[in-house]
A protein has these predicted regions:
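Extended, hydrophobic alpha-helical segments in both membrane/secreted and soluble proteins
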Residues: 3, 83, 87-90, 100, ...
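Long, ordered, helix-rich scaffold segments
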Residues: 1-82, 107, 138, 214-217
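C-terminal capping alpha-helices of c-type cytochrome domains
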Residues: 32-65, 141-153, 161-164, 180-181, ...
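The canonical Cys-X-X-Cys-His
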Residues: 79-94, 104, 198-203
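Gly/Gly-Pro-rich "capping" loops immediately C-terminal to redox-active cysteine motifs
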Residues: 97-121, 133-177
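Short glycine-rich, low-complexity segments
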Residues: 117-125, 129-135, 139, 191, ...
Length: 217
């Protein structure tokens, strides 16, 4: 416990970069189930909470489906096509994709628990800088997104679809949400084979070519 608190204190003092402690490591630290450790994690790393039992059951179901043999015979090219439709707008992988969410290339993608936990329950771990805020504007609009930059005059908000620069005089109320900008249920609409293809692509060590249907776009 003491060594964990020393590590978190070093992150707090900027002696250790926050990004050096991945979501995988944070999940391991949460396993201490120590109130002091969890409180310090929430302070210096970001929002963390336990995964609900219903979602844990979903994760176990996917793990039963995604056997080593099934993944070995999955189609990673089709998996990339699914990734481009569902993930690439927000995440980068192998140098391709968006920058709204964390870059996936260096994450612990070969760990099935890590991969599924982040897809099934994205709000369990939200690193600093990726917390979602809810912004109510005087014209009645309510926006959700990540704060990219803020000054006394302006707030730059990255939503799921666009980067918006708001005049702070337009903002009536702003609050932090405990939900991730990444939507839940990413796997719910996919068939078992599509899930296997997507996971095989995400957990792979190298890039694969785009399907011809996407290369021309």
């Amino acid at each position: 416990k003491e060594s964990v608190l020393l590590l978190l204190a070093a992150i707090d003092k900027k002696q250790v970069p926050q990004e050096d402690v991945s979501a995988f490591h944070v999940r391991q630290l949460r396993n201490f189930k120590d109130k002091a450790v969890v409180a310090k994690l929430n302070q210096v790393w970001g929002l963390t909470r336990e995964t609900p039992e219903k979602k844990r059951a979903q994760i176990e179901g996917y793990k039963t489906l995604l056997t080593a043999e099934r993944l070995q015979h999955a189609d990673r090219v089709k998996g990339r096509a699914l990734y481009e439709k569902t993930c690439a707008k927000c995440h980068r992988l192998f140098g391709s994709g968006g920058n709204i969410g964390p870059d996936l290339t260096g994450s612990n993608r070969t760990n099935m628990d890590y991969l599924l936990e982040n897809m099934v329950d994205p709000s369990a771990l939200i690193p600093k800088g990726y917390e979602m805020v809810v912004v109510a504007l005087e014209d009645g609009r309510v926006l959700n997104g990540n704060v990219v930059r803020k000054t006394d005059q302006q707030l730059t908000l990255q939503t799921q679809t666009e980067l918006m620069v708001l005049d702070r005089r337009q903002i009536e109320e702003m609050s932090q949400s405990n939900l991730s900008l990444m939507p839940e249920g990413q796997l719910d609409k996919l068939s078992e084979q599509e899930i296997a293809d997507l996971i095989a692509y995400l957990s792979g060590h190298s890039q694969v070519k785009l399907p011809e249907s996407l290369e021309s776009k």
